[in-house]
Amino acid sequence: MSARRRVTDFVKGKGPYVWVTAYDYPTAKIVDEAGVDGILVGDSLGMVVLGLPNTLGVTLADMIRHTQAVARARPRALVVADMPFMSYETGPRDALRNASKLIKAGADAVKLEGGAEYARIVEKLVKAGIPVMGHIGLNPQRVLALGGFKMVGRTEEQRRKLLDDAKALRDAGAFSLVIEFVPASVAKEITEAVDIPTICIGAGPHCDGQILVLHDIIGLTERPPSFAKRYANVADVIRSAVKQYVNEVKTGQFPSKEHFKE
């Protein structure tokens, strides 16, 4: 068995690093066995697990419970937990208290959305011994302010801000940086400008790694984003299996003798 991943294993030039989300014990165990480098317990669970319209309704308690489940499953991959909406925006003290709860739940690091405006919080967490992954570009927790899940970085002003954000988070001590839904050329420029690994989602091939939502790639999402590739249709497999189970119970085929004792 390979050694467990550590934050210090994620260095520039050693990728590409493969990340995927997971939210529970069985899927975390499966993706770890498949060889991913990192598992993100994302607040995307609000949409793909809890059926919410966005990530804003995800609570810290939700994140703690799902982080605990994932952490129990994996012997190898690095586990990063999202800090949910309003768990860090109120200041360094709240951020430190809430991030520490996710670390105690089993996360190896936390991820928070936002740019230079949160550099002070990132620095506070890092100084306290909590590794931080940054997240710039499309920030789903700002979906109301953005007016939807829209690409960021099309204008020169946005491009400059993304570069400034990346450098500020790097300087604050972030060990890695997620870049979401920006033009590939902008992601490439950011990747070349910082000496920490960048992990793309919907931002092209020029980053130091890629991350996707598990439910999107295995076919459990009804309308996955355009940047996600579907590698399987697990929904059809589940539906077929349950239909067969329903039919066998209705027709008296299950349980058969091998499934019970007199």
Swiss-Prot record:
CDD domains: KPHMT-like
Entry annotated with the keyword Magnesium: yes
GO MF terms, alphabetically ordered: 3-methyl-2-oxobutanoate hydroxymethyltransferase activity; magnesium ion binding
Chain positions recorded as Mg(2+) binding sites: D43, D82, E113
Family annotation (InterPro entries): Pantoate_hydroxy_MeTrfase (IPR003700), Pyrv/PenolPyrv_kinase-like_dom (IPR015813), Pyrv_kinase-like_dom_sf (IPR040442)
Pfam families attached to this UniProt entry: Pantoate_transf
One Gene Ontology term from the biological process aspect of the record: coenzyme A biosynthetic process
Pathways involved: Cofactor biosynthesis; coenzyme A biosynthesis
Binding residues annotated for 3-methyl-2-oxobutanoate, in chain numbering: D43, S44, D82, K111
Gene3D superfamilies (alphabetical): Phosphoenolpyruvate-binding domains
Catalysis: reaction(s): 3-methyl-2-oxobutanoate + (6R)-5,10-methylene-5,6,7,8-tetrahydrofolate + H2O = 2-dehydropantoate + (6S)-5,6,7,8-tetrahydrofolate
Compartment(s) of residence: Cytoplasm
Record keyword Transferase present: yes
Main location: cytoplasm
Keywords, comma-separated and alphabetical: Coenzyme A biosynthesis, Cytoplasm, Magnesium, Metal-binding, Transferase
Catalytic machinery residues: E180
EC numbers on record: 2.1.2.11
Assigned GO CC terms: cytoplasm
Cofactor: Mg(2+)
The record's free-text note on cofactor binding: Binds 1 Mg(2+) ion per subunit.
Family affiliation: Belongs to the PanB family.
Annotated function: Catalyzes the reversible reaction in which hydroxymethyl group from 5,10-methylenetetrahydrofolate is transferred onto alpha-ketoisovalerate to form ketopantoate.
Protein name per its UniProtKB record: 3-methyl-2-oxobutanoate hydroxymethyltransferase
Gene of this entry: panB
